[in-house]
């Protein structure tokens, strides 16, 4: 599939703009200025449209290629501000720290937590161990999951110490000061950020970190 058909700009310009935004803490205006210094005049609103178009595509391609996971999961949520109000980004990683999935919700309750865990089980199968914080909503959700999917009663572990890994894994989200103006904008952008970060972590664990290029990774994904 040609993802760059009918585009005014060369695909290399688009992949650089999208890759820089999703990997680094740059604004759309920053990227517009970087491209201008290299002789390419792109308005910051165009960079925004590219990110909104390609970020969810990259995320779906990445998900199709990563369907395996270690059977110990860590699940947590972090806060995202959208139009001045807090929303909640549920995130999950496996025992090796690889990203499993994300889900942005307006509410932090047992229904949201249950739906997210159910979605993970549908993707990766039943886990042997699920580590979470001690939030009451998560405990209720896990009790429902254990009953619905007939998991071992002791598969749920609520440990602050053991859950530190995923709390540290939130840093690439928290370091950004992005002000999202809609839930859809936030969803699309965060999907792209998580996709590139997941690829970065995979390269880091395979000792290839010094050769990591978000633009190169995007080019490979969109060429497949």
From Swiss-Prot:
One of its GO terms (biological process) is transposition. InterPro entries: DDE_dom (IPR032874), Integrase_cat-core (IPR001584), IS_Transposase (IPR052183), RNaseH-like_sf (IPR012337), RNaseH_sf (IPR036397), Transpos_IS6 (IPR047930). Residues 33-52 bind DNA. PROSITE patterns: INTEGRASE. GO terms for molecular function: DNA binding. Residues 73-222 form the Integrase catalytic domain. It holds the Pfam family DDE_Tnp_IS240. Involved in the transposition of the insertion sequence. This is Transposase for insertion sequence-like element IS431mec. The lineage of its organism: Bacteria, Bacillati, Bacillota, Bacilli, Bacillales.
């Amino acid at each position: 599939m040609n993802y760059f058909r009918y585009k005014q700009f060369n695909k290399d310009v688009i992949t650089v703009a999208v890759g820089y935004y999703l990997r680094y803490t740059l604004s759309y205006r920053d990227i517009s200025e970087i491209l201008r210094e290299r002789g390419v005049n792109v308005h910051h609103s165009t960079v925004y449209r590219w990110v909104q178009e390609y970020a969810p595509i990259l995320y779906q391609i990445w998900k199709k290629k990563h369907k395996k996971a270690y059977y110990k999961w860590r699940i947590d949520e972090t806060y995202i501000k959208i139009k001045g109000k807090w929303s909640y980004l549920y995130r999950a990683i496996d025992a090796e720290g690889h990203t499993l999935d994300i889900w942005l919700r307006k509410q932090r309750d047992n229904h949201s937590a249950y739906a997210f865990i159910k979605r993970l089980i549908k993707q990766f199968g039943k886990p042997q161990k699920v580590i979470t914080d001690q939030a009451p909503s998560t405990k209720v959700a896990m009790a429902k999951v254990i009953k619905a999917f007939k998991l071992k009663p002791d598969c749920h572990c609520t440990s602050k110490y053991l859950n530190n890994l995923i709390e540290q894994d939130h840093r690439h989200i928290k370091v950004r000061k992005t002000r999202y103006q809609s839930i859809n904008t936030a969803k699309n952008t965060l999907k792209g950020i998580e996709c590139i970060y997941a690829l970065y972590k995979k390269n880091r664990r395979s000792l290839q970190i010094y050769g990591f290029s978000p633009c190169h990774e995007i080019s490979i994904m969109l060429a497949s």
